[in-house]
Each structure stands twice: as C-alpha cells, then as structure tokens.
Amino acid sequence: MRIIVSDKIESVCPEFVGAHVEIYVHNSPYSAGLWGEIDRLGQEFRQTLTTETLKDISGIAATRQVYRACGKDPSRYRPAAEALIRRILQGKQLYQINTLVDLVNLASIRYGYSIGGFDADKFEGDTLTLGVGRAGEPYEGIGRGTINIEGLPVYRDAVGGVGTPTSDNERTKIDDNTTHLVVLINGYDGCEADAPMPSTFSSWRATTATVPTEATIFINKVKLWNRILTAAWHRCASG
C-alpha cells in the first residue's frame, strides 16, 4: 500500500508524521481481555480527566488544531478519540463491535491519536492519499450516514474518501469477516514521547492472531515512527 501526504496537509501541519501497518488477521466477535483493559482505562479517565481537560491530550489537541487550520470546527466535528473519551467521562459504555474495531478504539483512547482501521480488501487501487475534504464531497460515516467532510483531513483511495479523524467510511469498514487489515496512525503533533503502538501490537497479536506483513512510515518530516514500528513488528514476530 502506497501512502501520499498532500501538499495541503504539509502546509497546515508541517510536523505531521504517520505510519501504515498492514496485517493479515483472524477477527473475533469479542475479547474479554481487551474489554478489561478498556474498562480499566475508563476508570482511570474518570479519575483524572474532564470533558475540558481531555482536549489538552497532545494527540487530540493537535488534531483539533489541524481541523481549525483546515476550516473545520472541532467542537462540532470531534476527532473520534476525543468523542470516545467524552463518552466514557459521561458514564456511557463504548460500543462493542468486534475485536479489531474494539482494539483500534482502545489504541485511540489510550494515546489520543487519530488511528483508523480498514478492511484493505475493500480499497480501490493501491494508493491512499491524505488530503482535505472538499465542499459537497460524498462521504458516508460508519453508523452516521452522510457527513460533511469539507475541511476535514481525509484519506482517499481511487474511488473517494475512506477515513477521517472523525469517522471512517462505511465502504471500507472492518467487519467480522475481515482478514486483511490496514491501520493508519496519524501524529499531527509529531510527538515521539507519547507515540502509540508497541504494547498495543503485542496485545493485538494475542487477541486476533495477527501476522504482520508490512509496516511503513509516511511522512513529510522524518522523526518518529521507524523505531516504534520496528520494535512493534519484532515483538509481534517473536510473540
């Protein structure tokens, strides 16, 4: 899978750095261990965060800033990581979908980064381009219907949008039959200290029998993900 970062994203977020991980998987309906970790994090968040202070989490704050730079109101179109944590702080349970989706959600709330998971066999073409949504661009968010993605960062394949930090697209969503997974990790803050993935990857292998096949860096400023993904890959392989 080839990933391109557009000039527009480079101009509004010169520090952007991200990663693409491609894995063959065996999905499952539910993982008790995974939900134990989600519940543990929920308890921690309720003790340490409010719906205002969660906006200061580095990955969330940076994503909100990119929204503003692109002309989108981040309080109306919240990044998914922020929306998920807000739901927890409001005393609500996260939706249980399947192990892969639940794991991506866990990574998102744990680190605050925009992390998208996709069924790679549903992509059209072999290239994804990260750009900015256009006026009137069609986009169906998962479980949300039509979303106005004008001003949102968006990944597009050969047909159209597949993922934004607010919602991924119905067309390429993970389902119970997904066996070819692509994960896109987006560091709009470029902050190495808070970077996700090594512990998440080891849990991932345990819960979904993953076999990592490719991990690449897509960046406009090289500074973050190579060491992290190499370590994650080796941990998965050694199991």
What are these regions, as identified by a protein language model?
Residues 1-229:
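Charge-biased, low-complexity intrinsically disordered regions
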